[in-house]
């Protein structure tokens, strides 16, 4: 291959001084001829001897690399035009397991899309100047936290002409970033997978998207938008809700957070209790009027707490705890930055901090992961930390999170707590069951024998609708009872097995009060505020908070055989003031038994009831990951720089 350069014209600068119009026309004609003959490539030799290569196409003049037309779809991995051709925009290749795509290295876009940069400073134009920092490409940008992305856009460097073009685009981007900042999501990265978002985070993102629509006269319904928010972030969320209201909209919020309730104009309190004891409007009216009234005539428990007639009292004294502690050195993962953390044993320890400050990373990926590995007796190195000691004082670790108590509709509170095993034993011990030779398995809907085989003991039959969601219809053989007719003929105190499973926890506790093996388990469920659940309620219908409390209840009746480290993540989600009080009593009971409870929490009643606090921060995302305060609630309250 040979490069042949043909000289088209030579123009002296002096000609522009003598006859500028003629010189420009001559230059234009020369460029057009050169571009035509060279298929879009032209070289210009300057008076100082330097050469400059220009192209009329999307081709790099230096190495000849071609470039597609730059348009929005180039930066979308959902478009065949922009997706990496090797992995089709997935970022992984499925062989025996999902492996990172070797071409795009998991970035999901074609190489050309990654060569377009934005910068916060002026880039060198001369080709002789070395471009050590070209700025950020789209993958770099979406990998930023929302707060960092906003700072980048505020400092974006554009030429005068480009800035004029980009003004409306930059404004739309910054407005949307502001909306997410205003609802307390500054710590999230823009490329965060939707599947990894908590319910509260997903709800606040939907709320942020509504701020940009400018709707007027709309009704917004929100279900506990403050879930997972630190008290500091509540103010921004409340400000956002008030902004929507000022636009002329109506905001209906289901909420237990005190700050949000006090920001409301009108209060509707439903109760007085849960389940069969609820469903009644106990109090309603303008909030200021209800608070200013001389007496809480409605008897509303909510108003009683809001008027400070009832409150969660401070512990009389903080526990001294037991000898020994779990010491973790060099905890490093995500935004955790080489932190040393000490957890005293035999105490209620509360982990606090603003959203995204590293609390969950520490609890799940450092503390639980390594403790579980130690108790499993596996010889594996410490992960995400330099060292961890103190687990020798404990016998086991239990993570009580908000994951479902079962993966199928067959799981329910009775099966999870073990109460159903004793209930089946009770039915099989009846004279009628013994006369028929029936064992406990006859009263199980999980195995063949006594269950309805038409629906396999589900009570419903799934009808596949192909492109539509699956429809469930009541079984026409057992009419939803889940059992064969003969099985239901056996009763205990006038109730068959189906009728027992339809009882609420509260009803069943009274019904089985003379059977300790069953009553103890039901008492635990009742103590956690779950008296309204039915024994046979499907696990798939329980909220995350309810599932978590079922797990806590299952620990209360467990005999004390070894000291346990309990780890809880925001157990107060979805709880009323009164339920929070009950939860605190239960957690304190676990500690009184010699166990250690570590809980992530934003609820101030739980925080003030703790024996020891570990506060992460000071901010979320890259601005967090440090232990900024530790000690008793009184000691942490004196620490400057701690939002908690």
Language model regions located:
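Conserved phosphate-binding elements of NTP-dependent enzyme cores
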Residues: 1-644
